[in-house]
Amino acid sequence: MSSDPRQAPYSYQPSPAQYAREERPGPRLSTPNNRPYDTTFFRNYGVNPFVATEDEVYSTFGMDVDTASYTIARRFLQDGNMPDRESVRTEEFINYFDQDYYDMQDLFSIHVDGALSEFGRPNYHLLRVGVKARDVGFDGRKTANMVFVVDVSGSMDREDRLEMVKRNLYLLGENLKEGDRVGLVVYGSEGRIISDLTSDKQSIMDAVSRLHPGGSTNAEEGLKLAYKMASRGFEEGKINRIILCSDGVANVGRTGPKSILSRVKKFAEKGITLTTLGFGMGNYNDVLMEQLANSGDGSYYYIDRLSEAERLFKNGAGALLQVIGSDAKVQVEFNPDIVDRYRLLGYENRRLEADDFMDDSVDAGEVGAGQTVTALYEIRVKDQAIQNPNGFIGQVRIR
């Protein structure tokens, strides 16, 4: 049995270009003020094809709670442009919205439903598979040591970048839990420590007010200082998190992705995780920001407006900080007697082999308190199965 969905003989086959894992600037777009987006980087992850169940009954993927793709698209539209095609990641659009799954006592609850497909083809249905992590609330969140790494390079000298970052940090300061500690590192041409870890809210606010842009972008140096601070202040049993606020540009130092990503991954294995918050449009590196979060066992968000920050930081940022499941995976096993073929909508960069589901060494996704993961499948039900309303479509497992 082939585990490669692209080998399904009856499946829709995308063109080779759709599988190209290329990284390139998006098209030159005209904004209302005639400033182009010609240095905004996205990656093409292809499109999942249909898979025949006679070839593979398992669909496996890593859970993903990133939502940056949706808010980036919203920013494109706000500026009067259509979103770059490669910026659209279907699962991040779906997971941005509350699916209204009910709470249960377990760490995770599974929700499955479906309906006839709206695309009009006979025997095609849309299947929704949802997973919800238990919400711990403000009081239930562990206390946290948070080191913010703020890009203050010249590329951040815009209203929607550094000034937005500062407003976000002020907002977080108002929502800290007793026992939380915050440190602040900045980087431009070089990295600097602005404030060591402290629980004094006024000191935190004062440090934020001193942020000013200037210089080139030595992201690696800034992260290096942040990890040193986080390591010194590491406390077992607490949340130890680096939060990077940047437009993703890195142009000084050993800034090839491998150098930065390997450092991030090494510290994630020690319990110091990384979340990335993206700001700005034009000269924005979506690819790097997502890769950093993935390597750091964290999540990636794009802040296009202050209300988006309020959504993330509400209730003491429990969903942002408190991890309920690490390397979390979903596996759907389809019943080949009922389902002829299926197609997972989105999660192209989270696909796993069937055997990876039980392999704890395989990196997957992290899910925070109260967060939901939703996957949509387009499935074709066999003709004879239509006459058997008691047949089951399949089973859902999480790990």
Residues covered by each model-derived region:
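Juxtamembrane/interface motifs at transmembrane-helix termini
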Residues: 94, 204, 331-332
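Sec-dependent signal peptide cleavage junction
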Residues: 1-30
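Long, highly charged amphipathic alpha-helices
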Residues: 72, 92, 167-171
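Alpha-helix boundary/capping residues
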Residues: 77-80, 97-100, 211, 296, ...
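Exposed acidic/Ser/Thr-rich ligand/metal-binding surfaces
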Residues: 111-328, 382-389
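An acidic, Ser/Thr-enriched
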Residues: 21-22, 26-87, 105-114, 119-127, ...
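Extracytoplasmic
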Residues: 82-99
